[in-house]
Design a protein with these regions (language model features):
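Alpha-helical transmembrane segments of multi-pass membrane proteins
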Residues: 1-207, 217-478
Length: 478
């Protein structure tokens, strides 16, 4: 099958999938305020819906392609009607949310209600098409279509703040999303027709009686038949889950930390999510696969640098140091984790299970960082926890035999990982020792801390300060 049509269908589906995320966030902000928690809880909801979409794709992929097309088209028609109904009713229900005592749960409910069905169906997009290709004679390079999917996601994410939100009303945006679903449904139907025709035609070597030409899930074939290490898929299944969970936990933790210490403005959230997607695009390629080890080294260097910076308290230092270092750690960590994830990919026959476990890890990591962490931590401890997790995973990566680690001295990497762990733990102890009282809710974290302050006469006195992130709201000399 020619790759142009599947690639266009995957690109458009991913474009719509990530275009609706900031659009839904924009819809909810007037009701819940501009706090970063609105966005991070939305991310957790999106990651959970992504899991539902991958599970749906995994289950229906066992059916014939024609049956899959009919079922998916029927559900897409329902999603179009659902989205159109919401576009009409949105002004009427706009003021009915945001007044409960559980805003996080209410945001989750709104995401499920407003965009749950179309999001689940769009989430299944790339997995379904790749599964169709894997069953045809044109199964080479199916995993690289995942990079096309992430490119579409990145374009959809950037298009919203630059081209859509400033010029199009919110109601028109939702109608445009419904129209996009219709176009996507047509493309998906045609892709399914070609996949079914190719499989049932006489061009497939698997249907010509040449059994040896048909790769089995455990066979080492082309670069996309198994991971580069040639390890059976079952032995790597836990890694698919853990690496995805770690990367999503990192994304949400960095977003919360930078939004709390700088300012919770939506463009920063989109930039961070865009960087996360770029790491997927770069990692799911031959370059990302070969360079995973070096990205692990850069990740450790970034963690060490950020651990030093976490001791700084001045707001100007926060903006000029925390922001670039936080972005760098997110990029380096994403390239490392996703490159490792690509290296341990299974044969195409097992790709729906692979993506299902990736989505499950993402959902668990997202919910842990944005929903569970605020409930159990009085401060933003999820950020140093994410840094510790990166350091430990980097040490584990270099403890495993892998061609990508050749040329790197493992002992030096383990030493660097140990330094990173000691610095992060030391920073956590230092911050905990300063805090007298900390309170955290959906809208942020406030701390009463011991500090020093210089008087107008130049004297340095001990004091207590009330802070929200790096912003000091008041000082009392002791």
């Amino acid at each position: 099958m020619k790759r142009r049509l599947p690639a266009v269908a995957i690109f458009l589906g991913a474009f719509l999938l990530f275009g609706v995320q900031p659009m839904l966030g924009r819809t909810l902000l007037p009701s819940f305020g501009g706090t970063a928690a609105v966005w991070t809880v939305c991310l957790a909801a999106f990651q959970t819906l992504l899991l539902a979409g991958y599970f749906y794709a995994h289950m229906i992929s066992r059916k014939p392609v024609r049956a899959q097309r009919i079922l998916h088209a029927a559900l897409l028609a329902l999603a179009v009607v659902w989205t159109g109904a919401f576009a009409v009713l949105r002004p009427l229900i706009r003021g009915r949310f945001g007044e409960s005592g559980q805003p996080a749960l209410e945001v989750l409910f709104c995401v499920l209600l407003f965009a749950g069905l179309p999001y689940v169906l769009l989430s299944a997009n790339s997995t379904l098409i790749q599964a169709w290709l894997a069953k045809s004679s044109d199964s080479r390079g199916v995993y690289r279509l995942y990079a096309v999917s992430n490119l579409g996601s990145f374009c959809g994410l950037l298009a919203y703040p630059l081209l859509v939100e400033p010029y199009v009303t919110l109601t028109a945006q939702w109608w445009g999303f419904a129209a996009g679903l219709v176009v996507y449904a047509v493309l998906l139907w045609r892709t399914g027709e070609e996949a079914a025709g190719r499989r049932l035609g006489g061009t497939s070597v698997c249907s010509s009686g040449q059994a040896d030409a048909c790769p089995s899930p455990g066979t080492v074939g082309s670069a996309d038949q198994v991971g580069s290490a040639g390890v059976p898929a079952d032995k790597n299944a836990w890694l698919w889950f853990v690496l995805s969970a770690a990367s999503c936990f990192l994304l949400n933790a960095v977003t919360t930390y930078l939004s709390n210490d700088i300012t919770p403005f939506p463009l920063l959230w989109i930039i961070l999510l865009g960087i996360y997607l770029c790491s997927y695009i770069g990692a799911f390629s031959a370059f990302g696969e070969r360079s995973a080890g070096w990205w692990g080294v850069l990740t450790l260097v970034g963690v060490v640098a950020l651990a030093f910076a976490m001791r700084l308290e001045k707001a100007v230092q926060t903006l000029s140091i925390y922001l670039p270092l936080g972005v760098a750690v997110l990029l380096f960590g994403g390239m490392f984790l996703h490159g490792w994830l690509y290296r341990v990919r299974p044969a195409p026959a097992a790709l729906t299970r692979y993506y299902l476990l990736i989505a499950a890890g993402g959902a668990v990591g997202g919910v842990a960082a944005s929903v569970v962490a605020p409930l159990i931590f009085s401060q933003i401890w999820e950020f140093p926890v994410a840094l510790l997790l990166l350091a430990l995973l980097a040490a584990l990566y270099f403890a495993r035999p892998d061609p990508a680690t050749q040329g790197v001295k493992r002992e030096a990497v383990w030493l660097l990982a140990g330094v990173a762990v000691l610095l992060v733990v030391g920073d956590m102890r230092h911050q905990a020792g300063q805090v007298i009282l900390a309170m955290r809710n959906f809208y942020g974290t406030s701390r009463l801390v011991n500090t020093t302050a210089r008087t107008a006469f130049g004297d340095v006195l001990t004091a207590r300060a009330l802070r929200h992130g790096s912003v000091t709201h008041g000082i009392q000399y002791r």
